[in-house]
Amino acid sequence: MGLGLWIRTGVLMAFLTALLVGIGYLIGGRGGMIIAFTIALFMNLISYWFSDSIVLSWYNARIVSEEEAPELHYIVEKLARQAGIPKPKVAIVPTMVPNAFATGRGPGNAVVAVTEGLLHLLNRDELEGVIAHEISHIKNRDTLIQTLAAVLAGAIMILVDFARWSLWFGAYDDERDSGSVIGLILAIVLAPLAATLIQLAISRSREYLADETGARISGKPHALASALMKIEEAIRYRPLRRGNPATAHMFIVNPFRGVDFAELFSTHPPTEKRIERLRKIALEMGIVF
């Protein structure tokens, strides 16, 4: 792992740890801060080594063998070879909402996950375009920081829920005055926004890069553009109802429509802009669509 990625990962983990500790302090004072810091250290360790398993479990994703999904394995193996990385494991998510994501610490232990809905919606070329995009995240070593962010942001949301319950049902006396209540309200409002901004910071530019890298790996920018349009349209009418919004940045298209309240705070670039960039890449490759 390059120095730049180590620095980005360290900054991310430090910031999220500080956010967790701050929320802990607002909930339980010094004792809450100590507990939150202990949880943060534990979560950092667990998320580094087991974050891929955690994310897969959130979506009941199942690792499938070549015998179970021969065509899918063939596509993943071919594109991984063209990208110059080891073949990732292959997982299928049991939902008809079309989407895909990659997870893992690095190319040596990565997983590419696709939903059942994606396999039903896309043709072969479009599926290759999507998988090439996910392979690119692995090749560009985005998966570690994306997965860490998902797990730690998920922990933040759990503490925010706890803070909300503490605010509603907690008993406050003169020693814990209105300042504590105001602090809890600020935590409830601002912590999710901070988590979203972190996702935004690590996601948007990397999505453009994965689009470009994937298009060049597969040689089919037009197929990826078509896939993005189909996925976007399907999610508009059938968003993912169950799942953790903290993982939104991991998917090729945000599956949680309605979570982002403005393009400014979207975890993904607008699909139209991604397609326009793919058109330019296609022209460079001598492809018109």
Swiss-Prot record:
One of its GO terms (cellular component) is plasma membrane. Gene3D superfamilies: Metalloproteases ('zincins'), catalytic domain. The chain crosses the membrane at residues 9-29, 31-51, 143-163, 182-202. It is a multi-pass membrane protein. GO terms for molecular function: metalloendopeptidase activity; zinc ion binding. CDD domains: M48B_HtpX_like. Binds 1 zinc ion per subunit. Zn(2+) binds at H133, H137, E207. GO terms for biological process: proteolysis. It is found in: Cell membrane. Its EC number is 3.4.24.-. Its cofactor is Zn(2+). The active site is at E134. Keywords: Cell membrane, Hydrolase, Membrane, Metal-binding, Metalloprotease, Protease, Transmembrane, Transmembrane helix, Zinc. It is an enzyme of class 3 (hydrolase). It comes from the Archaea. HAMAP family: Pept_M48_protease_HtpX. This is Protease HtpX homolog. The lineage of its organism: Archaea, Methanobacteriati, Methanobacteriota, Thermococci, Thermococcales.
